[in-house]
Regions:
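Polar low-complexity intrinsically disordered regions enriched in Ser/Thr and small residues
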Residues: 5, 21, 33, 51-55, ...
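Short beta-strand-to-loop element that shapes/binds the nucleotide-sugar donor at the catalytic cleft/hinge
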Residues: 7-33
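Positively charged, low-complexity intrinsically disordered regions
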Residues: 5-7, 168
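Short, small-residue-biased leader/transition segments that mark boundaries at the very start
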Residues: 1-3
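Catalytic core and acceptor-binding pocket of nucleotide-sugar-dependent glycosyltransferases
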Residues: 36-126
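Generic structural signal of hydrophobic/aromatic residues within well-ordered alpha-helices
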Residues: 34, 61-64, 68, 144, ...
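C-terminal catalytic/acceptor-binding lobe
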Residues: 88-174
Length: 174
């Protein structure tokens, strides 16, 4: 497919750019429409910056709303809400998206020296703790479990999803 046929644009999320996809923070629950098996996915895109032609972008917005509404009817919320839904769509319809490097969505607290668009820190504008709540301290066992969960468990889930041949059905109807 020619790059001109790609009517939508998404930007890679800086912390996951160039990383093995099994470490991307996709929704892996299997309950949400946004769920992506460990054996699938290539890019992790930021939910805060996307675009495209007017018609294609409006169709994308409608599809994201439809998927989110289906999840809500089933009492499910995707891990990172609309960002998770967008990542599932990128995985399902890769030919529709032009994927830009993270230079177009660089957080101001992580300058790279060649950022094209700088994203401002939320906490400068709103009180994030009042919205999300304060982080709870973790004990030794919780910290070790978190490290295992982030660094080693994805390999086991990848093996499981590969053996079970879990895949994403690719679609061209967005």
């Amino acid at each position: 497919m020619c790059i001109r046929d790609r009517s939508l644009t998404a930007v890679c999320h800086l912390p996951y750019y160039g990383k093995n996809p099994i470490f991307h923070p996709y929704d892996r629950s299997g309950k949400s429409r946004a769920s992506i098996p460990y054996s699938c996915g290539q890019y992790y895109v930021a939910g805060g910056l996307s675009g495209g032609t007017a018609a294609a972008y409006l169709a994308l917005c409608r599809e994201l709303k439809k998927r989110t509404d289906e999840d809500l009817q089933n009492n499910v919320i995707a891990r990172f809400h609309d960002e998770s839904q967008l990542n599932r769509l990128v995985a399902e319809t890769p030919g529709k998206f032009r994927i830009l490097p993270p230079d177009y969505c660089t957080p101001e607290e992580t300058p790279t020296g060649h950022e094209a668009i700088l994203v401002l820190q939320k906490s400068r504008c709103i009180n994030v703790e009042s919205v999300k709540g304060a982080a709870k301290p973790q004990n030794f066992v919780q910290r070790k479990w978190e490290a295992f969960r982030l660094n080693w468990l994805p390999y086991l889930w990848l093996a499981r999803d590969t053996l079970l041949r879990r895949r994403i059905d690719f679609k061209n109807d967005l």
